């Protein structure tokens, strides 16, 4: 008999295993590296300007993709269409490059940041989403073979 505790533990374990992949770890580590070098007043020139913007959209899309795959679909067959990922990029650009520069001193309106948001979205669509979808599908197939 399956207890609630065992079910919650298996869902949590699955969420961690699917979420933490090489791309997600790269996004988080690069963001931490850029924030750390900014804090030390020793920014890395090219990376400081656009890497955090590049990884922001894939980071958000990946977390939403994993949660959506675990909650709403079975087998990892779901994938975001390109227009949804570009919509995420557009909304991110509007908020961080359109509205927030008028209300905060930290944000600046920069066209290259907008390009970085869209490049990150295209990267997620072309590379990372396929990687994660295959990973979820394999885990689902493994689970089906174990239950037989």
Regions found by a protein language model. Name each.
Residues 7-148:
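Bulky hydrophobic segments
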């Amino acid at each position: 008999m399956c207890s609630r505790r065992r079910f919650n533990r298996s869902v949590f374990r699955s969420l961690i295993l699917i979420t933490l992949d090489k791309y997600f770890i790269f996004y988080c580590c690069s963001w931490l590296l850029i924030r750390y070098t900014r804090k030390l007043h020793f920014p890395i020139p090219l990376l400081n300007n656009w890497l955090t913007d590049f990884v922001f959209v894939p980071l958000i899309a990946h977390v939403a993709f994993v949660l959506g795959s675990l909650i709403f679909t079975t087998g990892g067959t779901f994938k975001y269409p390109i227009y949804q990922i570009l919509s995420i990029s557009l909304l991110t650009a509007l908020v961080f490059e359109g509205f927030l520069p008028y209300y905060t001193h930290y944000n600046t309106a920069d066209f290259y940041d907008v390009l970085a948001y869209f490049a990150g979205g295209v990267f997620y669509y072309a590379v990372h989403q396929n990687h994660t979808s295959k990973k979820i599908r394999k885990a689902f197939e493994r689970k089906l073979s174990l239950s037989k």
